[in-house]
């Protein structure tokens, strides 16, 4: 009668056999050992394009001449605590070559042959009122005073300028606002008192120069926020 091996010996053989068996390698072939999961999934969105950053809030306004001819577009982009204002002419020959004053005015109206809120004789776009002042701001330069637009000989021009004098909410609040291009250059009331006197003998700029920059007639207007 054959002798039976003790249980301990059998267990040792099983362990030995397991230790001597060839290792199994992960494979992607059908019917073979599946890949071993390590517990670390592939990076989320690997291979996919990264999401584009959110666009800055903006307003685009179309400026027109008194006869309705579109003259320029103005885009206001708000980010990092300031506004970037881009003005581009859209019709050559409407604006004369040279510098043109550009201001934001305090009433969102662009009416040809209209009367100013303070009264007086009618004129183009006068119902837009004077230069815009942001809430809590007084004095010159006004909040709505922007860099002048320089027009080339062919009547076209582009201006990119920045300002932290107002927010988007300021421009769209209350009666809204309008952006106006003037016929002439803005002197920004730079009339040195030590060199120039008013007609009445008072040195420095007068009230008209302080409030308008002597930029002349209003030749193009667009209500901000009206498209």
Swiss-Prot record:
Q: Which residues form the signal peptide?
A: 1-19
Q: Spell out the coiled coil positions from the record.
A: none
Give the Gene Ontology MF terms in alphabetical order.
copper ion binding; superoxide dismutase activity
List, alphabetically, the Pfam families matched: Sod_Cu
Sequence intervals crossing the membrane: none
Task: Please report which positions carry a covalently bound lipid of kind N-palmitoyl cysteine.
Answer: 20
Chemical reaction(s) catalysed: 2 superoxide + 2 H(+) = H2O2 + O2
Sorted alphabetically, the keyword list is:
Antioxidant, Cell membrane, Copper, Disulfide bond, Lipoprotein, Membrane, Metal-binding, Oxidoreductase, Palmitate, Signal, Zinc
Q: What is its EC number?
A: 1.15.1.1
Q: List the disulfide bonds.
A: 110-221
Indicate which residues the UniProt annotation says bind Cu cation: 103, 105, 182
Q: Which InterPro entries does this UniProt record tie to the protein? A: SOD-like_Cu/Zn_dom_sf (IPR036423), SOD_Cu/Zn_/chaperone (IPR024134), SOD_Cu/Zn_BS (IPR018152), SOD_Cu_Zn_dom (IPR001424)
Q: Which CDD domains match?
A: Cu-Zn_Superoxide_Dismutase
- Membrane topology designation: Lipid-anchor
- Cofactor binding note of this UniProt entry: Binds 1 copper ion per subunit. Binds 1 zinc ion per subunit.
| Segments of this protein annotated with the region Disordered | 23-55
Please tell me whether the keyword Transport is annotated for this protein: no
At the top of the EC hierarchy, this enzyme's class is oxidoreductase
Where in the sequence does UniProt note compositional bias of the Low complexity kind?
A: 39-55
Keyword hit for Protein transport:
no
Q: What Gene Ontology cellular component terms go with this record?
A: plasma membrane
Q: Which cofactor does it need?
A: Cu cation; Zn(2+)
Give residues annotated as binding Zn(2+).
145
Q: Which family does it belong to?
A: Belongs to the Cu-Zn superoxide dismutase family.
Tell me, in a sentence or two, what this protein's role is.
Destroys radicals which are normally produced within the cells and which are toxic to biological systems. May play a role in favoring mycobacterial survival in phagocytes.
- Under which name does UniProt file this protein? Superoxide dismutase [Cu-Zn]
Q: From what organism does this protein derive?
A: Mycolicibacterium paratuberculosis (strain ATCC BAA-968 / K-10) (Mycobacterium paratuberculosis)
Lineage summary? Bacteria, Bacillati, Actinomycetota, Actinomycetes, Mycobacteriales
> Gene encoding this chain?
sodC
